[in-house]
Curated annotation (Swiss-Prot):
It holds the Pfam family Ribosomal_L15e. Keywords: Ribonucleoprotein, Ribosomal protein. The keyword Ribonucleoprotein applies. The keyword Acyltransferase does not apply. GO terms for cellular component: cytosolic large ribosomal subunit. SMART domains: Ribosomal_L15e (SM01384). Disulfide bonds: none annotated. One of its GO terms (biological process) is cytoplasmic translation. This is Large ribosomal subunit protein eL15.
């Protein structure tokens, strides 16, 4: 097996491998860091390369922490019936991974989100690493693997749900029975003239 396969196997069930001790030590530092932090190299090199990462100019990796669980809704200041408060059991229509991608895109407005992957979680938050690409960098424009990002059709792809996590949340990973109303989008379905 190659080195990447060993890393992949270890990350499949982190609790049963050496990754558990590594993560325990890492998370103590991660909790003290800002919510969006650029890092020098990916934590999971196998997953990053699988999703399109290359160690070259114009590509950076950012680690983002996002809260776990349901949405943190503010409590209304004026009186309301307890039944209509709308605080608990409110969940986002977006996945936490998609929220992480959008926050990374907001912090780096000149870059586009290529992909992202999970790196850890504790009782309060989850951490994702986001691969960002600068579409205007010459090394990106001249690389056929990434030049499609420079065409202009992919601006703000994280906010438009065009990343892998975004498409999954929009129901576009599935086809056939049960996915009839997912295309071209949930809101756009049925608007087309016959």
């Amino acid at each position: 097996m190659s080195m990447y396969n060993y890393v992949k196997e270890a990350w499949k069930v982190p609790a049963n491998s050496y990754v558990k001790e590594l993560q325990w030590a890492r998370m103590q530092d991660w909790r003290k860091e800002p919510s969006v932090l650029r890092i020098e190299r990916p934590t999971r090199i196998d997953r990053a390369r699988n999703l399109g990462y290359k160690a070259k100019q114009g590509i950076v990796v950012v680690r983002v922490s996002v809260r776990r669980g349901g949405l943190r809704k503010p409590r209304p200041k004026h009186s309301k019936k307890p039944a209509t408060l709308g605080i608990n059991k409110i969940t986002m229509a977006k996945s936490i991974q998609r929220i992480a991608e959008e926050r990374a895109a907001k912090r780096y407005p000149n870059m586009e989100v290529l992909n992202s992957y999970w790196v850890g979680q504790d009782g309060k938050q989850k951490w994702y690493e986001i691969i960002l690409v600068d579409p205007c960098h010459p090394s990106i424009k001249n690389d056929k693997s990434y030049s499609w990002l420079s065409t202009g059709n992919h601006k703000g792809r994280a906010n438009r749900g065009l990343t892998s996590a975004g498409k999954k949340g929009r129901g576009l990973m599935y086809k056939g029975k049960g996915a009839e109303k997912a295309r071209p989008g949930v809101r756009a379905n049925g608007k087309k003239t016959k």
